[in-house]
Amino acid sequence: IPTTSGTGTEVTPFAVMMAEGGRRKITLADYSLTPDAAIVDPQFVMRLPRSITADTGADCLTHAFEALVSIFSAVYTDSNAMQAALMTFRYLPAAYADPTDEEARSMMHNAACIAGIAFSNASVGVNHALAHAFGARFGVPHGRANAIMLPHTIRYNAAVPSKFMPSPNVRSYKAHRKYAWAADILGLGGDAVEDKVANLVAAVERLLDSLDLPRSIAELGITEEQFGQAMPDLVKAAFDDPSWRSNPRMPLLKELEKLLWQAYRGRGQEAAAAVPAETKA
C-alpha cells in the first residue's frame, strides 16, 4: 500500500537497505520481494506534504526515463514508461500547487505505479547509482537526489559513446533516439535528434523549477571541500551500485566523477566548467 506517489515499490522486486551507519545504500533485487497485490489508493497521499510530493514525483519521472533507455527496455516497458512520464508532466505540477486536487493526486499515484511496472522489468540506470551514492553520504532524500542528477544523466546518455553497454537486446546505441521520441510524445518540438533531446532536458528543468526543487548539490548546503573530500568514496559507491548495469552507456570512473561535479554546480552546460581543475583529466 503506497503512501507516497513515487517509488513504485508496490509492484517491484527491489528494496534498499542502509549500511555503514547510514552512509551507503545497498540495493536488493529478488522477485520474492514483489508483492502479491497492490492497493493504489490516492486517499493515502491526500495529506502528503508538498516537499515530499515534489521529491517522490521526481523519483517517478526518473524511473520512467531510466526504464525508457535501459538496455532491458522493450515495447511493453516503453509504453508504461512513456505513459508515466506523460502523466507526471501533466499532473505533478498540479498536485504540488494544490495538494487537495484529487484528480492530480490520483493520476500521480497511478503514474508512480505505472513507472514502477516499467522499471521493475527494465530496471533503472546511472542516475540512480549516483543519487544513491551522494544521497546516502549526505542524507539527501532519494527523489531530490534523483532530480538533481536527471538533466545531467539525460545529456550524458544522449551523447553516443564509443563503447556502450553490451546486451543481447541491444544491437546499436539508441538512447538518444528514445529521448527524441519522448520529446515527440510530450509535444516539445524540434527537428534533429539533438534539438529534441535539448528540448526534453529543458522541459525537465522547467518541471523541476516549478516544484521548487534544488538544482545543484551545492544548494543543499554541502561545501565544495566536503564534496571533494567525499568524491573517492562517492565514485566507488556509484560504481559498485548495480543500478548502472542496465544503463545504455557504460560509465567510466572519471565520467561518474564528472557527472557528480556537474550536479554539484548544476544548471546546464555551464556545469561542465565547474569541475575543479585538479580533478579534470
Where are each of the predicted segments found?
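Flexible, glycine/charged-enriched surface loops at secondary-structure junctions
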Residues: 72-80, 95-107, 122-127, 164-165, ...
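Gly/Pro-rich interdomain helix-loop hinge
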Residues: 144-229, 269-270, 275-281
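C-terminal and late-domain segments of enzyme folds
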Residues: 50-114, 118
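Glycine-rich phosphate/pyrophosphate-binding beta-alpha loops
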Residues: 6, 113-146, 240-245
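A glycine/threonine-rich phosphate-anchoring loop and its flanking beta-alpha core
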Residues: 1-75, 160, 174-181
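Short alpha-helical scaffolding segments that buttress acidic/His motifs in well-ordered protein cores
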Residues: 61-65, 108-116, 130, 150-154, ...
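Short, amphipathic C-terminal "tail helix"
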Residues: 226-281
